[in-house]
Amino acid sequence: MRICRNSAAWLLLQVSVVCGQLPYHALKLLGSNYARTQDAFQKLCRAGYLEVVKAPGHKSYFVTDAGFEAYCWVLQKARRKSNAFIWGKPTGTHNIEKAVRLSRINEAWLFFVLLCRRKYQTSLQIKREQERKAVRSTDSLKYSRFVGCIYNEERFIHPVYHFGNGNQRLNPNGEKNAAVRLAGAMMSFEKVILIETPEAIVDILDYLLWALKKDSHALRHMRLNFHITWEDNAILLPLDGSAQAFVQHFDRKDWRAGIAQMEEQEKGKAGITLSLLRGQWMELLEYLAREPDPEAPVRIIAWNFQQSVLRVLRERGMLPTKARIGMCLLQAE
């Protein structure tokens, strides 16, 4: 198979070498032309450059020896006499449990580091640090949905979780071991949860809304299930590239002050105003849990990447009939 530089196949091959095993869903993060990326993926598979791992509810891929040789050949041909840096061949696995875990860790790294250019450390790197420091029970990290940490400019931390299609449970032991790493940080902020589709985000919000209307036992169950409470106030991000600008900007210098100013301006207007500008949904859920008058006017201010989630909420009848949505834009760098 002939691979041309600047083609979708070359981009896909490079990402497969740099990131390692990835879920099929990660193709949506590689450029705006998804159909072209899918076509390139099929060609690379037919050429034997990528190998697919399948199981019910899971599909991932990794670069083969032939694919890695093709990558090296294209890179050396393009740079000829220069001393080109060539990545080592990443490992892939056919073990389904390991494939699910590894591909999600790698997809989160792809999203935060390559796409959003944030300071980020994977859970595997954190696990190795814990082992060097003789922290006990690090093996249970592999059973959790914890995939890494984001650092901001002052090295504050956001723990990151990957919920896949939304139907996930977090392992309490894995959660505790993740907390060991956070204990040495200056401050820990909200959890960031990656979810593949807007529909899956709405599934989680629907469950949380149900739990908020129940008693304390249901709330305890909610914490064990999704680990999203008012105290956590987790940031939910769709893994489709639309949240790239938000991830690049949030928690930078003056971010919180700027958001507070925008919210104050909007909430000064008549009627009820709910804000999603911090990436969190608990303010809206708390309002909906009170079962307000569906005809009452309410204004929801949100970023452009949250519009698809709000659309699904409206389609499912979870938003008040007269709810108006104000959209704010962020430009990716």
Predicted regions and their residues:
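Basic, Lys/Arg-rich alpha-helical nucleic-acid-recognition elements, primarily the DNA-binding modules
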Residues: M1-A84
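Generic detector of well-ordered alpha-helical segments enriched in charged/polar residues
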Residues: L13, Q38, Q42, W109, ...
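Surface-exposed alpha-helical segments enriched in charged/polar residues
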Residues: Q14, Q42, R46, L110, ...
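Generic surface-pattern signal
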Residues: R46, C72, Q76, R80, ...
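Short loop/turn segments at strand-loop or loop-helix junctions that form parts
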Residues: A55, Y161-N165, E196-P198
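Glycine-rich loops and low-complexity Gly/Arg-rich segments
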Residues: L75-R79, F85-K89, A218-R220, R324-M327
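Exposed, interaction-prone assembly regions rather than primary DNA-binding/catalytic cores
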Residues: G88-N173
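C-terminal regulatory/effector modules of DNA-binding transcriptional regulators
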Residues: E175, A179-E333
